[in-house]
Amino acid sequence: MFGRNSKKDKVTLSEDAYKKARRFFKFLKPYRSVYLVGWLFLILSSITSMLFPALMGQLLGTNGDEKPIVDIPNVDLTNINTILIVMLVVFGAQAVFSFIRIVLFNHVTERALKDLKSKAFDRLIKYPIDFFNRNKVGELSSRIATDINLLQETLNTTIAEFFRQFITIIIALGFILMVSWELALWMLAVVPVLAISAIIFGRYIRKLSKAAQNESASSNAILEEVLTGIVNVKAFTNEQYEINRYGSRIKNILKLNIKSGIMRGAFVSFIIFGMFGGVAFVIWKAKGMQGEGLITSAEFTAFILYTIFLGASFAAVPDLYAKIQKAIGSTEHLMDLLEEDVESAEGNLLTDFKGAVEFKSVSFAFPQRKEIQVLNEISFKCAPGHTTALVGSSGAGKTTISALLLKFYNVDKGAILFDGIDVKDIATESLRSNIAVVPQEVILFGGTVKENILYGKTEATDEEVMEAAKKANAYDFIMSFPDQFDTMVGDRGIQLSGGQKQRVAIARAVLKDPKILILDEATSALDTESEKLVQDALDKLMINRTSFVIAHRLSTIRNADNILVLENGKIVDQGKHDELIAKTDGVYHKLNNMQLS
């Protein structure tokens, strides 16, 4: 998962998984003092709970002349009224200890998970574009949410309960040893069998659980894709196709979860039969010892209760163990996410940047498809403030050039120079802070119109935002909304038209005030009226800026200083519009004729 793991890694856990799980505890380290206090109260609450069988045995089994099971100085535990008072005090103490333990564990867990979420998001947002090409967004978000929820339950409840059961087992066995070492040995005889079974079953359950988690992430990715592209799904009447595609995934999840449930059920059933069978046998032996006068009636009653507690703890441990194994698998996924390489922050800052760009014999293939050459020996220059247009059929390499300008990928051969400096030597953040993009498909984030424009410059003033909107020809339609710049947009807000979205994107770019502008077919999907407004805003934005225009409509690039004609990843021609249109046998001329016809 997350790009580097092999297929095998998706269904098995290795020793490395446990190492990664241990790495998670560094998130607990800042809160270790609170966590240790929580563990202290866990131990205290467990110990006080284990006084119950002894006191109850004394209450039910005492006849007034037997020595008390529990000896408390200056307290008469042969008197049932005194025993009841002591029990109430013990229950009160246990309630207080449990409350403090739960509060402290929650305090640590929520803060540690907050740190983990922050770290995961911080890493995720800094990963290179190639990472997101290798991993589906829906699968990533599902994986992170599911794994963190599982960790939350494990840290808050499962681990505490797991160790509480062990404390119960130790104290119960200790009491049984005090009563009769022979009975204790009979009880302990089943432990190795249960332990070996736990290891065998646990490994298999873990494997099935991890496979189910991966299938669940894949199904959530399909769900997100379908809901995001619901218009296309309905337009192509592919509802049934998507139902079948999603259905096949959840059937796989069902099979894995049922198989896991069968294994867990078999394991728990085996534990119940083995443990309670042993308990019944030991109680039978204890009853015989009572008849022979080897143990008192109070000891026998307490013995039965401790034995029941012991059996219940042994029965609970396997399921808790399986949950912890699932949490280890989740931790491995999260640690894998944190181990991916982020984009390098190293490099020189662009100072007094003019905006000159040069491609020198650039060749490039995407990391996941190295066998397909996308760009081949691309060379051109763009002077500061000039406009370079990129034209060509789909797949010719236009968008790839814009991706390389933004340093989304490193070139395989050649070099890209900004003001004569190799892009490899420029800090990524410094480069991108000097570039603005107006894409064909504008994404508006949930929030207000103002907040979306501020994405171009988060610290801008209200006056700067309004001025940017005016320059982008967006001010009038924004002011027509009831809440004006505070109008909510996105999934939960007002739906903007394509032209309105484009003008918000242009306002972002105006606010950013970049040296380099990339227009990725910004007007190709608009109607004539919207295109005129957007094109007018773009023309104003491009003044005195180095601009790269990926053009679908050739009419929009007539005034470009240089037009690069791309075909199969190569520049087959370049020049001004009039020069290229005059070449009747050229690719540009043919493209122009196709659009006119």
For each feature predicted by the language model, list its residue ranges.
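ABC-type nucleotide-binding domain
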Residues: 73, 353-597
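Hydrophobic alpha-helical transmembrane segments of ABC transporter permease domains
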Residues: 40, 48, 97, 145-190, ...
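An intracellular "coupling" helix at the cytosolic face of ABC transporter transmembrane type-1 domains
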Residues: 30-33, 129-130, 146-155, 159, ...
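Helix-loop-helix
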Residues: 175-189, 259-332, 337
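Transmembrane helix-loop-helix hairpins at lipid-water interfaces of multipass membrane proteins
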Residues: 35-97, 177-182, 291-297
